[in-house]
Every structure is written in C-alpha cells, then in structure tokens.
Amino acid sequence: MKYKDLRDFIAMLEQQGKLKRVAHPVSPHLEMTEIADRVLRAEGPALLFENPVKPDGTRYDYPVLANLFGTPERVAMGMGADSVSKLREIGQTLAYLKEPEPPKGIKDAFSKLPLLKDIWSMAPNVVKNAPCQEIVWEGEDVDLYQLPIQHCWPEDVAPLVTWGLTVTRGPHKKRQNLGIYRQQLIGKNKLVMRWLSHRGGALDYQEFRKLNPDTPYPVAVVLGCDPSTILGAVTPVPDTLSEYQFAGLLRGSRTELVKCIGSDLQVPARAEIVLEGVIHPNETALEGPYGDHTGYYNEQGHFPVFTVERITMRENPIYHSTYTGKPPDEPAVLGVALNEVFVPLLQKQFSEITDFYLPPEGCSYRMAVVSMKKQYAGHAKRVMTGCWSFLRQFMYTKFIIVVDDDVNVRDWKEVIWAVTTRMDPVRDTVLVENTPIDYLDFASPVSGLGGKMGLDATSKWPGETDREWGRVIKKDPAVTVKIDGIWGKLGL
C-alpha cells in the first residue's frame, strides 16, 4: 500500500485496527508520554489524541498523533513493505545505489534498467498550490504556543518539537537535506535547533555561514507528512540521491513539493504543518536538559535559534509528536526495523557478514552484534573496524561483538555463550581511544570524544592461538529424527 500523505496512512492503520482515537481530554504535559509509553511497551496501536488540553483546561485546536511507528510492522508499512523481512529488499536497493556494480553482461545490464528508470523518474514534482498552505500565519499571528507541543518528562526544561522534519540546503548543493532534530520551545516564534556539528543540516548551515556571515539562513520544519518521506529522512540514503527522491521510490509515485512562501526551500505539498523561518547570525541559546533515548537527562549546550516567521498548515491539521526515553521507545523500534535495511548495505561491503543486529536495549546504535563466515586469522578485527567506518550511522557505536555464523546474533543466550567460551579478555578485546562519541553520552571522558570496544567472540585460528580449539557438541541427526517420530508416544 502506498500513502500519498499522513492522512492516508492514518486511515489505513485505523481500518486495520492499528490506530486508536483517544477522545478523553489528555494534556501534552507528561500525560501523553505516560499513555504512549504504556501502549508502546504493550506493542499497541498508534494513538490519535483528539482532545489535547492546555494547562488552563481549555482545548487545543489540533489533535496529536503519537506512537505512529511504535511497532516494526508499522515502520515496514510506512516504507511500503509487506513485512519487516521485506525491508531487506529496500536495503539491497540502497546497497546497489551506494556502490553500483558494472553489469556482468547484456542480460544483467537490461535487468537493472527498470530500477534505474524508476529512480530517475522519481524526481519530485513541484506544484504551485498545496494543501499545506491552506492556512497561513505570519508576523504577530505566529504563535507556537497554539500548537500542542509535548512536554515529555518531569525535568524537561520546556516543551519540545520531536518529529520535526528539518529542511535545509547548502550553498553549493542542488539537493535539499532532510533531518530530524529536536527543537526546544523558547518563545512564541523561537525554537532552539539542536543539531550536532556532523549532521546534514548543521553542515549545510556551517557552509552557508562561511560564505554569508551576515545573512539569515533559511530553514523549514515539516510537522506531519507521508510516512515514506519521514522514514526516508532517517534511512542511510546515498549522497547522490535526495531523500525526496528516495521517498518517491518507496511510495511508487513522485513526491509532491511546494516552494515555501518565504524562501526557495521546498516542502511536502500535503504536509500537515510547516514552520518557515531563519537562523540569524550568531543567535544561539542554551538548550536542555531533556530526557533522551538513553534513559537519562542530557547535558545542556548552546545551539542556533530558529526564528519562525511563518506557519502554514492544512485545514484541521494533525500535530505529529513522539517522546524519547529508556528503550523501548519509538526510536528504538525504528532501529529494530531499519536494522533490516542495514544488513544488505553491510553485506555489499563485507560479503562475509551473515547477520547484523543492533539490540534496542543498546539505545538503537551503541552496541552491535555481527556474525560472519571467518576465513583467516584477524578477520573479526577487520569486520569490526569496517563496521565502525562504513556508515555514518555506526560512528557512535561503542561496542561491537563479532561471532561466528553458527551463533544467532538476535539471541542473547547464544551471544553470551560465544563471548564466554571463545574469548580471552586480553587477546580478543580491541580498545580504541579518542573516537567520535554521541554528544549525549555522558559516560565518555569528554563531550563528543571517547573510546570504543570490539569483542572478538569468534573461534580462533592458527596464529591467534597455539592451543587445540574446542569442537562444538552436535547431536546425532539420525537420533534426532527417530525421537521426533516417537515424541508423541512418550507422554512428555
């Protein structure tokens, strides 16, 4: 099923019993988090809070959509896949686009033509009139306090925009960048844009600022759009492909865009709400603290201030929100689903990898378990260093455990068995100092810089050990078949 906008997706989820409307008045201040957290942990439906209420008890004008991607199955649906396992096909497409192989012959070349044709035919379609501009607030009418922005945790400093799809463009780039950055509400037309220096939006901003030190930098933030575009923004799309183009490929139809009223940036035409504005030179503010996906409140830091000059929206718009906290939360669920996209990408680069797993308990990316067909001494160390460096998404992975292909990376019992029986703590541990670490990781010695650990839990080859290696106990297949045949007669 392909969804042209968020409302299409909501309708399908509701039809399948995967979305529930909450008519009872609920406050965005802490209450929505409590409800969404309980529902997500129970693997429950997406939620549409129809009557969000303000602190004074009056009602906000706009409903709040939460827990949209609260199960891997809903993530797969949003990406146009029939099941979570089908996400690997999307990963295979991305792997090909990232590093296309020369055709092996005429037949192979022709077999690739439909995919290439589909990709290049998915250039966005720019329209002049769009639903997202049916209502326009400008100047003094701009008031972010009229939006039901969620205040997620008791010690959060202020309400927080969490699912804002931030649109930027660098001075030398034709394609626009889409990124998800949290934004702290500090005034009726002011948000703090918390983007880390290596993220696409921050890089665009830095390049622009070098060339235009005194010029306001245009930014747009999209709140609520079709699931393909949202998920395209968190998928490792090759630099040669725009997220809008990738969203069209997922959807099977070109992404419709409209030019912002106040800048040349383009936003999804059927978005629910769009914030248009600028970042003024040298205007920053203290951001945080906020409860985050680690399960802790993070440190404060100074980040650019986004001044909202205009808010455009559809008639009766829906405000899309989430919360982040100790796993499981929505980012952790997204990580579980996108894990299936990552596997073919890694296998394209390292064909010896048989599986790859990011345990959600590891905050989506801080720990990875990799299984491989080992071929020589030291091979596991090559794989772990390769994983750290291949995709930007794994730059902050602190721990990588490498196991043989007879170990199920998604079963902690098997992984712990491999670690405790195939590892020597001194010989098989790789420690790397002074590497990039998540800004939110307060366990690192300094902010943004810390260590990494690789655990080689593979069987050791000559050159790695002089000892005779243990043989894994295996059952006699003939006995297993025999017992299978009489099992029902044993009264067990």
Swiss-Prot record:
Membrane topology per the record?
Answer: Peripheral membrane protein
Note on how the cofactor is bound: Binds 1 prenylated FMN per subunit.
Q: Which UniProt keywords apply?
A: Cell membrane, Decarboxylase, Flavoprotein, FMN, Lyase, Manganese, Membrane, Metal-binding, Ubiquinone biosynthesis
Cofactor(s) needed for function: prenylated FMN; Mn(2+)
Q: GO biological process: what's one of them?
A: ubiquinone biosynthetic process
- Any idea which positions bind prenylated FMN? 180-182, 194-196, 199-200
Q: Which reaction does it catalyse?
A: a 4-hydroxy-3-(all-trans-polyprenyl)benzoate + H(+) = a 2-(all-trans-polyprenyl)phenol + CO2
UniProt: Mn(2+) binding residues: 177, 243
Q: What single Pfam family name could you report for this chain, choosing any that match?
A: UbiD
The UniProt entry's GO CC annotations, sorted and at most eight, read:
cytosol; plasma membrane
UniProt subcellular location:
Cell membrane
Catalytic residue list: 292
Metabolic or biological pathway: Cofactor biosynthesis; ubiquinone biosynthesis
EC number, as in UniProt: 4.1.1.98
Task: List, in alphabetical order, the Gene Ontology terms for molecular function in this entry.
Answer: 3-octaprenyl-4-hydroxybenzoate carboxy-lyase activity; metal ion binding
PANTHER family listed in its UniProt record: 3-OCTAPRENYL-4-HYDROXYBENZOATE CARBOXY-LYASE-RELATED (PTHR30108), FERULIC ACID DECARBOXYLASE 1 (PTHR30108:SF17)
Q: Which family does it belong to?
A: Belongs to the UbiD family.
Query: Quaternary structure?
Result: Homohexamer.
Say what the protein does.
Catalyzes the decarboxylation of 3-octaprenyl-4-hydroxy benzoate to 2-octaprenylphenol, an intermediate step in ubiquinone biosynthesis.
Report the protein name in the record. Answer: 3-octaprenyl-4-hydroxybenzoate carboxy-lyase
Query: In which organism is this protein found?
Result: Neisseria gonorrhoeae (strain ATCC 700825 / FA 1090)
